[in-house]
């Protein structure tokens, strides 16, 4: 293969590439002693090091370090006001969630704090969290609303997300989660709140270009199937993709409903059954595992991993970063947890934070793979093997982070 190189191209030389490309017949799509050629914001070519002659363009010798696609976190609640650490302490001291809620705690505490926070306050706190994700190699992240629960404050949250996307070297997928829970003012009339979402919040914020998918908490303590379907029908009228928090605490059938609307993903899924798994297999919907919430809530029922494998359902892994049930801004830790708690293999976990996570956000195949034509979003690690990245926690093996072809975190010297 002959490549005509330009002076502005960049060659990342002598690498171990975990491409995650299904066309590469090896675990992790691993290629040893290969060069990665970047032109502008995309990968131009991947070739054996010996096959590519040095030209006048920039050459960066990574000295057999591991290069992977940039990590993708496909489920976070990154923007919120307040802090729930005191509530966690109270729970650890024996107070029940019902008692905390009666005192104004729980999700309503976050809603109140978020409503009381200014744009600037929310931007500052969210920026600190986002910086932590980027420092671990995340190049694409999903961020949900869901702590405003009225038009004004859901718009405020999504405007903060938009601001973060405009001022950081990371791709952000914004999701409308107005159907997170009923706000206090609609506590006894959830159908009326769903009216507000479907008739006002969703269409107005969609027309302002503030989100790209709709999510819902479909659960016995959230919204029922009929209410969830009303939301999906409203989204369908605007051709908006849907996804759902489903089967976390009980089996309600939410996964099958998401699949019926060809949803992007079903998330949590501890109580998913075989009928639900089969529906996901037919629709191509991604199963997103959230081990941080499983750990923090001390759950005991794991998602049906063997069934997902049996029916070839793509599995993604995410942090579910949020203040109440998963306050962990580390996708590497979620990867470790997914292996230890759920029994995923390291390769399944890597697929879950690259190719399958990209699919869960409607971004395959230009994200989550190292291949010609994909975006040049990748990470150089001080490591030899993919499993090294999340085996040992407590220090960060990231050497260089590249977003759209540009180094954003680096300790490599050009050679």
UniProtKB/Swiss-Prot annotation:
Binding site for 4-imidazolone-5-propanoate: 84, 147, 180, 248, 325
Key word Zinc present: yes
tRNA processing as UniProt keyword: no
Residue sites binding N-formimidoyl-L-glutamate per the record: 147, 322, 324
Matches recorded under Pfam families: Amidohydro_1
GO molecular function terms attached to this record: imidazolonepropionase activity; iron ion binding; zinc ion binding
Binding site for Fe(3+): 75, 77, 245, 320
Cofactor annotation remark: Binds 1 zinc or iron ion per subunit.
Binding residue positions for Zn(2+): 75, 77, 245, 320
Matches recorded under NCBIfam families: hutI
Cofactor(s) essential for the protein: Zn(2+); Fe(3+)
GO terms (BP aspect): L-histidine catabolic process to glutamate and formamide; L-histidine catabolic process to glutamate and formate
Origin: domain of life: Bacteria
UniProt cross-references to InterPro entries, sorted A to Z: Amidohydro-rel, HutI, Metal-dep_hydrolase_composite, Metal_Hydrolase
Signal peptide: none
Protein name per the record: Imidazolonepropionase
Listed SUPFAM superfamilies: Composite domain of metallo-dependent hydrolases (SSF51338), Metallo-dependent hydrolases (SSF51556)
Natural source organism: Photorhabdus laumondii subsp. laumondii (strain DSM 15139 / CIP 105565 / TT01) (Photorhabdus luminescens subsp. laumondii)
Swiss-Prot/TrEMBL catalytic activity: 4-imidazolone-5-propanoate + H2O = N-formimidoyl-L-glutamate
